[in-house]
Amino acid sequence: MYRVWNFITGYSLLLIGGAIIALIWANIDINSYHHFTEVVIWADAPIGHLHDDGHGHVVRDLTLHYLVNDLLMALFFAIAAKEVWEAVILKNGSLRGKKAATPLVATLGGMVGPISIYLGIAYFLGSTTFDAVANGWAIPTATDIAFSYLVGRLVFGAGHPAVRFLLLLAIADDAAGLLILAIFYPSGELAPAWLLLSFGAALGVYVLANWLPRRLDRGDQLRRRSSWMRQKLSFWPYALAGCASWYGFMQSGLHPALGLLPIVLTIPHADRAFGIFSAAEVHLHDLLNTMEHALKYPVEIILGLFGLMNAGVAFSAMGEATWLVLAGLLIGKPVGIFLFGWLAAKPLGLGLPQGMRMIDLVVIGCVAAIGFTVSLFVASVAFEPGPVQDAAKMGALFSFGAAAVSIIVGKLTQVQKQEI
């Protein structure tokens, strides 16, 4: 297991701090909290959320909430996409080859289970409830990589193979979550022609800043053109392409927080992976890892702001959506991961990592039930601001209870902690 502790701890503390401040503020004065989050930074701006100005004109206003959720969070999703991309394409990537088969099948169960529980219970509560909450079906599918890792390390010990299994599952879950956001939760009327700008920017920067210099360097051991590109222009071509791609996503109606994903795939990367958010990656000097290192602290601050912007929910907001999200996470996740993991390991013959027991899948499922970050994000786009959104967010916040459940289940199943 690689050293990811410092990154995850910094990520977690600021995010939790922002969420706690938001919760306290919202329960003291909910009106001032909403006034703060929706303060307009730039009226009639070229970017921002669309609305009618009351005179028949559709304009965009850049609010503080939009700035954090739709613009700055694009950097967080870019880092998540970077880890997924490397895990899939690099020679020893953790999601490459047969070793990832069982975690990937278990990930599918970790999505099917929560969706089935969420929609199933909502259906039995009646058509009124079902119609009100159905669009939130994706909220309990999320697994928060950082918090799941922290709890998994606490339950299993840093050296236990179940922790690596959990990380593979969480990062595959992140990849699936990005797809769900892009496909099922557009941010407005779809205008897919604008995606030509995004993918055109990605193709252009890949050809001009990545492929062409390497092509011209054939036979040149000093790789002068690639070195000049890296030393003189650095990340700037990709930053400009990222701005164009983000704008294309915003105009297309897809969620703009995903707007940097096409650009991530074009950036020169290392030929090997050290692990998820690994500290060993400081020894890699490819542009993709260099950019991730530079973004580390800004993204920690952004996540703190994200917690502040999204976790401000009054406790009186608890409702049916709260319990549906919790049921999806606390029941659907463990059941789905165990059943699909068993299916992969036994009938399909894919097996489990050496040192893992079948019962460990139940504990992994409990740990993976911590949704928080991505669950909050999905709740904010699945529902319009109001009681249902607030209730769903409360369910995402309460998913921290999965940490206590995981510790208890770990004790009951006699997990033997393995430290490095």
From Swiss-Prot:
Membrane topology: Multi-pass membrane protein
Similarity remark: Belongs to the NhaA Na(+)/H(+) (TC 2.A.33) antiporter family.
Subcellular location: Cell inner membrane
Membrane-spanning parts: 4-24, 70-90, 104-124, 132-152, 165-185, 192-212, 233-250, 299-319, 323-343, 361-381, 395-415
Keywords per UniProt: Antiport, Cell inner membrane, Cell membrane, Ion transport, Membrane, Sodium, Sodium transport, Transmembrane, Transmembrane helix, Transport
Organism: Jannaschia sp. (strain CCS1)
Entry GO MF terms: sodium:proton antiporter activity
Catalytic activity: Na(+)(in) + 2 H(+)(out) = Na(+)(out) + 2 H(+)(in)
Disulfide bonds: none
Protein name (database record): Na(+)/H(+) antiporter NhaA
Transmembrane recorded as keyword: yes
A single cellular component GO annotation: plasma membrane
Job of this protein: Na(+)/H(+) antiporter that extrudes sodium in exchange for external protons.
Domain of life: Bacteria
A biological process term (GO) from this entry: regulation of pH
PANTHER family, A to Z: NA(+)_H(+) ANTIPORTER NHAA, SODIUM ION/PROTON ANTIPORTER NHAA-RELATED
